[in-house]
Curated annotation (Swiss-Prot):
Activity is very sensitive to oxygen. The activity in growing cells is enhanced when selenite and molybdate are added together to the growth medium. Tungstate replaces and is better than molybdate. Selenite is incorporated into the enzyme. Requires a sulfhydryl compound for activity. Inhibited by cyanide, EDTA, hypophosphite and mercaptoethanol. Sulfite inhibits the activity with NADP but not with methyl viologen as electron acceptor. InterPro entries: 2Fe-2S_ferredoxin-like_sf, 2Fe-2S_ferredoxin-type, 4Fe4S_Fe-S-bd, 4Fe4S_Fe_S_CS, Asp_de-COase-like_dom_sf, CT_Formate-Dh_H, Formate_Dh-H_N, Formate_DH_asu. This is NADP(+)-dependent formate dehydrogenase subunit alpha. One of its GO terms (molecular function) is 2 iron, 2 sulfur cluster binding. [4Fe-4S] cluster 2 binds at C156, C192, C195, C198.
Length: 893
């Protein structure tokens, strides 16, 4: 600690803090323009000049560290005149269009001019007038207003680490520009990912959101805090609302999640909520599914028909003839009500959702080894790790804000190991790139364990005190020598050895993975192998380590938590446990609940095709595009006697329904999402749903009442009270407690602070359980007829199958599907860039444009699954992981 005096006030501060930081901490104001608390201080603007006793000249407070005995004066006549002169210089170079500027009311230059009484600039300096750049769908750049503070440059280079923009020119001609190889280019040509974080930190009107142009002044907006509706990171947002419309979005400063940073979808992809294609009234099909049509109906008629048909099917065929799909895009409260309808009113455990296709192997694998099938650590932890092992996750495109934490850790000195067949962006930041063949992850992971055990790098004390089954694992991995694993995976033996040593030595090592690990015939075994690796090295139960599945959708974790699975009630309480069933049935006021696990999503589709499943209720899911072997899915849905779809758009699945119920988007309702890090967070209603659309919880509550269930909920908060009373991990959650930063479950009581790190003292199951798992080849392998390996995944500008395609800007950036093919393979086959080619598998074929690249290895092709025009899942296989029943979405052609 150091002692110093600021403006006569004696203060004590930690060594290394800057004068500006210490002053602000003690309530002393020093003006700044270039400074931003989340960016490296550079002292560009000079507004923060202060007088330091004994110094030869004034010093910039933003980047001058405090020292013992310093005596600082932040405001003297000389300093004040210098600040006025700086502001006058900036105004002399600045357009005087404050009356019409989008930044008016939120402009820091305007604030400084007001504070110091500088009305306009009169210095004889001029700047060449520059064109206003509007070449992309998201950001308007007016560099005439640029004050060369460098904030946007630092956000791009230090936070996003894209290095697209930089300072160009000198003196009064200095400004910011996008550059590539020394030449000025458009943002897109420069490699911009349009996160818009530069817009968020810009202190003036040089960078603005195109969507907000002319839509309102700062003081006219109602600002509503919410949570992003895209991926599972749970980024906090501020919605800017005027005249019942969301005009723009800014990142909300929650330091435990996104710290204000966003990606292109979170910041600019919100406009789908106002798309004219929204369903605004209930629809009822007239005629059959082949030649029939939809007509609009009242809510009374639509819900009465749904109630009648579901009751009729139960009466005629039994409860097991019904199936329900929960939604990873709807709130916890809504998922809770749907599974309650299925189990408590209609008597079936045939309840599942899209987690079956993505992370059901995570739930099965981590529940077996650790006792809890969720991310062990916090997103914020990632930045403090010493080693980060990313496997099966294209993090920069699928979870861009988590990728910022990875980049932050690397900048701090962490070693990044990336295991991926494709040259994903994180490879550019990696210490090691393990380019394994698709489907060989288990061999690779067992190979890492072989090295760790052989070289005795494992944590003997942790294993002895907190785990069981290690000796069996030790014997099992003996055969996975680096040489043998290299032969199977294609990864050099030396890289396998170095990766094992780096991970084991940490000191803090974290694992991040996604669907590249889970969507395999050995998906559950892959997850267990990751758990084995972490337990062997004692890398569980502390900050900066753990095993961290990155969940794909905004509330996929919550849908699982709420019992959107066929074998568990909310809180992962087994349906087979009589005590659990009694607790729920007593609270719900219904007879005993069904005690046998229900059908999974894929089993429901098979049962529908066989004529055993007669009716389905699908909430906010689109299996016609997202499920594997979609031809099979379409046939299954056609075979149903009755199909209800509740959604905000007429999706490919909704088009096959008998009744379509229009729900509400995230901005149009209250409720909670649970993010990938187990953080339960509040949604706040910002606008009304369009037309007669209703919040989904209200639709489900009305249907429950119509079907004879007597409980009428007054609000989602009341539903959460019921959830908390039945679910131990949510027991201490109330809406009031979630208002600040949310809470990470388990939250065991109203006094419990939440759990950022799982398994600190012991595992949820008691002892961690090592599992012996062995590599086996993929469900299909290349042959002469189908020689290519085919994999699927996401694109940065899209999310799943519908909502991002209803966002004008996102669709403009990526309007059509492409298939990535290696440049050597393309040359051999005579395929040119942009040429339409046909991709054929044993199950179907699609026509799509070729993207020729060295990003993907020879013998492999990659395609996004977002597009109905070329549905990737026409090609995929419905083979299942034997444990989690997850389908294999990594087939061959």
């Amino acid at each position: 600690m150091v002692n110093l005096t600021i403006d006569g006030q004696r203060v004590t501060a930690p060594e290394g803090m800057t004068i500006l930081e210490v002053a602000r901490e003690n309530g002393i104001h020093i003006p700044t323009l270039c400074h931003h608390p989340k960016l490296r201080p550079l002292g560009y603007c000079r507004l923060c000049l202060v007088d330091i006793e004994g110094a030869a000249k004034p010093m910039t407070a933003c980047n001058t560290p405090v020292a013992e005995g310093m005596v600082i004066r932040t405001s003297t006549p000389v300093i004040e005149e210098m600040r006025k002169g700086i502001i006058e210089m900036l105004l002399s170079l600045h357009p005087e269009d404050c009356l019409t500027c989008e930044k008016a009311g939120n402009c820091q230059l305007q604030d400084c001019a007001y504070t110091y009484g500088v009305k306009h600039g009169e210095l004889p300096v001029k700047r060449e007038e520059l064109p206003v750049l509007k070449e992309n769908p998201f950001i308007v750049r007016d560099y005439n207003k640029c004050i060369v503070c460098g904030r946007c440059v630092r956000a791009c280079q230090e936070v996003q680490v894209q290095r697209v923009v930089d300072l160009v020119g000198k003196g009064s001609a200095a400004r910011v520009g996008a550059t590539k190889a020394g030449a000025e280019v458009s943002l897109e040509e420069g490699g911009c990912v349009f996160c818009g974080n530069c817009v968020q930190v810009c202190p003036v009107g040089a960078l603005t959101e195109k969507a907000g142009l002319g839509q309102g002044r700062e003081w006219e907006f109602k600002k509503v805090r919410s949570i992003c509706s895209y991926c599972g990171v749970g980024c906090n947002l501020t919605l800017y609302v005027k005249d019942g419309k969301v005009v723009k979005v800014r990142g909300y400063e929650n330091p435990e999640v996104n710290n204000g940073w966003l990606c292109v979808k979170g910041r600019f992809g919100f406009d789908y909520i106002h798309n004219p294609d929204r369903i605004t009234r209930p629809l009822i099909r007239e005629g059959d599914r082949e030649k029939g049509y939809f007509r609009e109906a009242s809510w009374e008629e639509a819900l009465a028909l749904v109630s009648q048909k579901l009751t009729q099917i139960k009466g005629s065929y039994g409860s097991e003839a019904l199936g329900f799909l929960c939604s990873a895009k709807c709130t916890n409260e809504e998922n809770y009500l749907l599974q309650k309808l299925a189990r408590g009113v209609l008597g079936t455990n045939n309840v599942d959702h899209c987690a079956r296709l993505x992370h059901s192997s995570t739930v099965a694998g981590l529940a077996t080894t650790f006792g809890s099938g969720a991310m062990t650590n916090s997103i914020a932890d990632i930045a403090s790790a010493d080693c980060i092992f990313v496997i099966g996750s294209n993090t920069t495109e699928n979870h861009p804000v988590i990728a910022l934490k990875v980049k932050e850790a690397v900048r701090r000195g962490a070693r990044l190991i990336v295991a991926d067949p494709r040259r994903i962006e994180l490879v550019n930041f990696s210490y090691l790139w393990l380019r394994q063949k698709p489907g060989t992850d288990l061999a690779l992971l067992n190979g890492l364990l072989h090295v760790i055990i052989k070289e005795e790098l494992y944590d003997k004390e942790f294993i002895a005190q907190r785990t069981e089954g290690f000796e069996a694992l030790k014997l099992a991995v003996e055969e996975y020598t680096p040489a043998k694993v290299s032969e199977v995976t294609g990864v050099p033996a030396g890289d396998i050895i170095e990766a094992a040593r780096t991970y084991a030595r940490g000191p803090s090592s974290t694992i991040l993975y996604a669907m590249g690990i889970t969507q395999h015939i050995t998906g559950t075994a892959n997850v267990m192998a990751l758990a084995n690796l972490a337990m062997a090295c004692g890398q569980v139960g502390k900050e900066g380590n753990g095993v961290n599945p990155l969940r794909g959708q905004s509330n996929v974790q919550g849908a699982c938590d709420m019992g959107g699975l066929p074998n568990v009630l909310p809180g992962y309480q087994p349906v087979t446990d009589p005590g659990v069933r009694h607790k729920f049935s007593e609270t719900w006021g219904v007879p005993d609940l069904p005690g046998e696990p229900g059908l999974t999503l894929m089993e429901m589709m098979a049962a529908a095709q066989e004529g055993k499943l007669k009716g389905m209720y699908i909430l906010g899911e689109n299996p016609v595009l997202t499920d594997p072997d979609v031809s099979h899915v379409k046939e299954a849905l056609k075979n149903l006697e009755f199909l209800v779809v509740q959604d905000i758009f007429l999706t490919e699945t909704a088009r096959m329904a008998d009744v379509v119920l229009p729900g509400a988007s995230f901005a149009e309702k209250e409720g909670t999402f649970t993010s990938t890090e187990r953080r339960v967070q509040l949604l706040h209603k910002a606008i009304e749903p369009p037309g007669e659309a209703r919040p989904d919880w209200l639709i489900l509550n009305d249907l429950l009442l119509l079907m004879g269930y007597p409980r009428k909920y007054s609000s989602p908060g009341e539903i959460m009270q019921e959830i908390a009373g039945l679910t131990p991990s949510y027991a201490g959650i109330t809406y009031e407690r979630l208002e600040d930063k949310g809470l990470q479950w388990p939250v065991l009581s109203l006094e419990h602070p939440g759990t950022p790190v799982l398994h600190r003292e012991k595992f949820s199951r008691g002892y961690g359980q090592f599992q012996v798992v062995h590599y086996r080849p993929p469900a299909e392998e290349p042959d002469e007829e189908y020689p290519f390996l085919f994999t699927t995944g996401r694109n940065l500008y899209h999310y799943h199958t519908v909502i991002s395609r209803k966002s004008r800007g996102l669709e403009e950036m990526c309007p059509a599907p492409v298939v990535e093919i290696n440049d050597n393979d393309a040359a051999r086959l005579g395929i040119r860039e942009g040429e339409m080619i046909e991709i054929v598998s044993r199950r179907g074929k699609v026509r799509v444009k070729a993207l020729v690249t060295d990003r993907i290895p020879r013998g492999q092709v990659f395609m996004n699954f977002h597009f109905h025009e070329a549905a990737a899942n026409l090609l995929t296989i419905a083979a299942l992981d034997p444990v989690a029943k997850i389908p294999i979405i990594k087939p061959v052609l």
